[in-house]
Amino acid sequence: MNPSVTVITPTKNRLKLLCESIDSVQRQSFDAWEHIVVDDGSDDGTAEEVARRAAADPRIRYIRRGGEKSGANVCRNIGIRESQANLVVFLDSDDLLEPHCLGRRFAVMQRNADVDFATFGTKFFRRAIGDLEDRLDSDLIGDDLVRFLFFECPWIITAPIWRKASLVRLGLFDESLLSWQDIDLHVRAIAAGFRYLRFPKMDHHVRWQFEPTKVSVEQRRSPRHLDGAIATIQKFERYVMEGPGINWVRQRALCSLYFFVAERWVALGNLPAALRVWQQIRQRRLGSRVLHVSGVGLLIIQALGGVPGRRLGNRMAHKWKGWMRMRTNPELVVR
C-alpha cells in the first residue's frame, strides 16, 4: 500500500541528531507514512545506520545524492521526485515531530481538498524539548508576504504540509540560489496565489543552535553568498511584480533586505560593496532619496567609527529600521 505522507530529510554528517529525528517519525500515531532520508555525502556511518533501520522498517528509505550539485535543497528536490505519497512534509535532520503531527496534518488536508499547503506552529529547543520558551505561531495576523520580505517569517521549513502536485507546479526548490532558498519557496508560493491555511497548534520542535559550519552562518561571512543574496532579493521583487503587485509596504520590505545585505558587507570590512548594494534601492526605484542618504550615513558610521562607532551605528540602524518598518506615511520612504 502506498504511503499517504512522505517525510523528507536532507542530512550530512549528523548521525546522532538524525537518529533522533527518525525516532520521532517512527513514534507517529499515524502509520501511513514513508521517511526518505537523502544523504548529501556523509562519512560518519549515516548510510549504514539508516540501512539498518530501513531493513527493520521498510517505510524508511535511504537515498545517497548523486551528481555534482549538493546542498539541502538539492536533496529535498530529490526526495520530492522520489516520494510515493501525495502529501509532503520536510523535516531537517536535527528537528523532531510530535507523535500526533502527521495524523493531524493529514486530516487537515483531507478536509480541505482545495488548499495547496497548511502550516502549523513551531516550538524551539536547544538540547532538550522544553528548555526554551520560544515559539513561532503560524496563526499570526498580517500580510504573510510582507512578513517574509521583512525576515519576520511566519513559518519555517518544517511547519507546512504540502501537496506534492502543488510543489511540482511551483517548480520545487530553486537549486541555483545560494541564499534563502526555503524563504524563496514560501515567497514564491504566496506571490503566486497558492491557497493555504494556518493553524496555531504546535506540532513539531526545531533545534535552535549555533553551528559555524551551517550555511546560515556562512551567509553572514561569505562574499559569494552575499552576492547570491542580491540575486534572491531581485527574484523576490519579480515575484511581487508578477503576482500581487508592488505597493509601498512591499517596497520598504525589499529596501530592508538590501540594507540587511549592505550591513553584512560592512561587517566584512567592505564599505564600497555595502554602498553599491544600498544604491540598488535608487537604481531599482524602490526607495526615496531621503531613505537612501540616511542609510548611507548609517553604513559609514558603522564602517568607520571603530568599535564605538559600530555600536552607535548599530543602535541607530536598529531604530531607523524600526521607523522604516512601522511608518504609516510612504512619502519619506518610497518617493
Regions found by a protein language model. Give the residues of each.
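N-proximal low-complexity "stem/linker" segments adjacent to membrane-targeting elements
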Residues: 1-24
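A conserved acidic beta->alpha catalytic loop
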Residues: 24, 31, 39-48, 69, ...
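Conserved donor NDP-sugar-binding/catalytic core segment of glycosyltransferases
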Residues: 100-132
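C-terminal subregions of glycosyltransferases and related glycan-biosynthesis enzymes
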Residues: 202-335
